[in-house]
Amino acid sequence: LVHTLFKWVPPEVHFGDHPEWYSLAGDKRVPKRQLCFTNVGLRTALTKAVLTRIGEADPGGMYSVSAMDWTGAFCDCKPCRALVAREGTPGAPLYDYLAALGPQVAKRYPKARISTLAYRKGQSEPPPRTIRLPDNVVIIFAPIDDNFAAPIEDPSNADTLRNLENWPRATSNLWVWYYPNTYGPALPMGNLHRLAKDFRLFKRIGVKGYYIEQDAPGVYDSRRLADLQTWLITRLMWNPALDVDALIADYTDHHYGPAAPMIRQYIAALESATGAMQTRMRWKASTGQHRFLTPEFLLGCQRLLDAAQETVAGDARFLTRVKQARMSLDLACILRWDRLAAAGDVPFTKQQVITRYWDTYTAAVRSRALPTRHDALLSALSDSLKWYTVMTPLKPLPPPLDAIPAQHVRQFTPETAFLYRGVPKIVEDPAAASGIAVAMAPSLAKPSYAPAELPPNVLNMGFYDELTRRQQHAYAGKDDSITTGGYRLYPLGRTVLSSQCYVWFDWSWEVQFHDVSGLYNPDEAGKQWDVYASIRFEGPAYSPQTPAKQNRFYVDRVVFVAAER
């Protein structure tokens, strides 16, 4: 269990009486950030809670005291900021507290240990300069901000490497929380040599323990070559000096039989293509960030796996495993179908790939997942595949964008949009550009940070660059009135892309188009784009005459137009 601060000191219990225990955000104490570790009362209450729990549970166990899982500074009060300045890490207040907690725990429960996460570069990943954590405090280094397409020793992860190498100066108990895969769609990528290099690095630095977060999409159903990957991890944790190519050969020979050579060619293609990417891949990677999934690459890999299946067609056991190895590739073809179809000469239809993917996934879930999970897993996939089945060719853009040559325009439809917490929904809409749209009830109440001059019922939308933390806001209904009825283009302004960016909607940011990052080209890093969102509105907040009783907005596409043409 991690991200536990509010388990120990719940704000719903204590904030009313003790707001000073919680983070200062600007000039206001807030209950939804972190704790104020320099507050004496908070330290006393937290220590009491930890000691009480150890006494009630297992005096020899390990107990997590780790920050909540959201970004931002821990606390803006002067004592906390002074610790940050002294120690050179935003996590300094937490580490200062843990340095004091450790001896108190050791005195009463000498076999107990306290763990915390070194997590996020803007929070606790960098180690402190002068604080030395006691021996009963375990630091679990969790590089969530990494480039997931490259090992930690790659130049793109230089900050992570520096932080990891410096941690042994501050602790004798360094563990790693390792992320083998990205979240988001379970697409294929080459990461086997990455993890082998990382485990050799961990051995050299002196890492003493691991937690492998091997629950990203695809692992439980054998997508992403997850069985091979899991086996490699278990072998490399014991002996990171083992030859990873020899391990892959050993596993594939036994697992795929006569199809093993083709599977190894597929793995080699993934490793080479992923390693050649010049852009970062974040932990929640969109389809667009998998830049190597070009039509040529996808079709070449499909030919390899066609040959693999033909080779083992007479052996049900090996054939099942080859089909499972193919699932992520089939998903990539579904998500990239427009580009595949545009390339021409595709020897299969979209529906054929969808059917094969569904059949293989269903069989894998029923044979591998807990029976109590079958219905939920299959229902989720059925819902997502439905949209690829019902989507229609894109309708023409409305004026004035219809006059712009196609090579200067890129469009993004909502089938791969990130829908936070499942609150927004993808729906069929005959009026939408591709027959589907993302629908959501808007947050009509303006938050406290909203510009005061905004009129009521505007829709907040914008662009966010995760690398530079640059935000760009726009407001549908600010300069001209929102209209109900059909879809209409609303401008988001001019922007520059990065390899990790997205377009978002509503004050809650619960609708996010991450695939726009796939437009980024490092050779054209400063290229400017004019951005538009195609939206329709309904409900009494927008028109008293509307027949719709609920307020909703629908986004059917986001359009990028090159500023220089």
Could you describe each region identified by the protein language model?
Residues 67, 214, 539, 557, ...:
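Residues that line or immediately flank small-molecule/substrate-binding pockets and catalytic motifs
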Residues 501, 529-531:
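Exposed beta-strand face motif in extracellular beta-rich ectodomains
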Residues 492, 514-519, 533-535, 556-560:
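Extracellular beta-strand elements of beta-rich domains used
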Residues 504-512, 534-549:
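Short beta-strand-plus-loop segments that form exposed binding edges in beta-rich domains
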Residues 460-524:
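Extracellular carbohydrate recognition and processing domains
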Residues 2-9, 443-444, 449-451, 480-482, ...:
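Plant-skewed but cross-kingdom recognition/interaction modules and surfaces
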Residues 1-44, 48-245, 295-302, 306-315, ...:
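Catalytic-core regions of glycoside hydrolase
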Residues 233-457, 466-475, 488, 551-556, ...:
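Catalytic domains of carbohydrate-active enzymes that cleave complex glycans
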